[in-house]
Structure formats: C-alpha cells, structure tokens
Amino acid sequence: MIVRKNEFILDVDLENTIKYSREHSICNCDEDRNFYVQSKEKFPKLSKFLSELGLLIDRPDEIGSCAEEDYIDYHFVSYTVIGDVLEADKYEIDMFDGGLFLNIVIDHWYVPNEQKTDKYFTVTVYNIRLPWVLQEPFPENKDTEKDLIFYFTKYNMPVSATAKTA
C-alpha cells in the first residue's frame, strides 16, 4: 500500500507490519515500561501517525533513554515498518504532540528487530520526555557516558579514544 507522509512516499506492507507490531518481543526494563504505559494517551497525534503505518505506539523495537532528575529522557524511540521508502524528504517530519516538539525520521537506519525480511525501514521519534508514573522506585541516575559507550560499542559504531578512557 502506498502511503504519503509529508514529502515521503512509502510502500508499506500494512498487513505484515501490523502483525509484526503486535507480536514482536519488547523490552521489560523499567524505563521502557514507563513509556509503554503512557505513550498512547500522551501522544494521540503520534499514535495516529504510527497506526497509519501499521505500528502500535506502545510497541517500539528499540528505545534509547536515560533517567534524569524527575523524568525519563527518551533519546530515541524506533519502530520497524515492513516495506520500502520510495521517495524521501531530506528533512525530518516535525510534530507538536503531548506538549512536546517531536522529530520523526524515516530512513533505513538499523535497529535491532525480529524481521524475517530485509525489506523494511525505520521510523524513529526523537525528543520525548515523560514523567515517571510507575508505582515502583525511580531509576537511579545512571552514568550516561558509560551507557552511550556501551550502546555505540554494541552496534559497532566508533567511539573516540578519549571517550573510552573516561
């Protein structure tokens, strides 16, 4: 099915994307669970945008986040769509939703997923911040630098020598 989003033209296998979005495994860490429980209600426009691509807002493939003083900063939330990008805009899609200015990037960026095909693209949302709503202790402030080094190392991305020694 051909879907147009701003200047993007996408060939979406809607049936298989919906099936995948409902069935793939999701992370059970505390910060991700905090996102799952409030994302639908907090971001109705984003939820609608994603559903038009066969995606469920509360079932992303990958989330990068860190606990700040009294909220969680979700650096990125990535989803996988079965299909292809036929035509792409050189800019992201901007959306104001849930009191936040969100950036949405559609591309062929790799995120860990359980796809059984090479024909997929990703939808990644940036700039999400959410309060802690789970009835359990707020995560301790983690060492963000160490987390970033771990993340980049995990996905075979270069890390500068100065960062490795910190």
Segment roles from a protein language model:
Residues M1-E52:
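N-terminal cysteine/histidine-rich coordination modules
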Residues I2-F8, Y79, L102-I106, A161:
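Hydrophobic transmembrane signal anchors and adjacent membrane-proximal interface regions, especially
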Residues K5, K19, K40-K48, K90, ...:
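Context-gated lysine
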Residues K19, V37, L53-D58, S65-E68, ...:
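Mitochondrial intermembrane space
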Residues D32-N34, D84-A88, V133:
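Generic structural motif
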Residues K42-P44, I93-F96, E136-F138:
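Surface-exposed beta-strand edges and their flanking turn/coil or helix-capping segments
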Residues P60-T124:
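Amphipathic protein-protein interaction modules
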Residues W109-A166:
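Glycine-rich, aromatic-bearing surface loops/beta-hairpins
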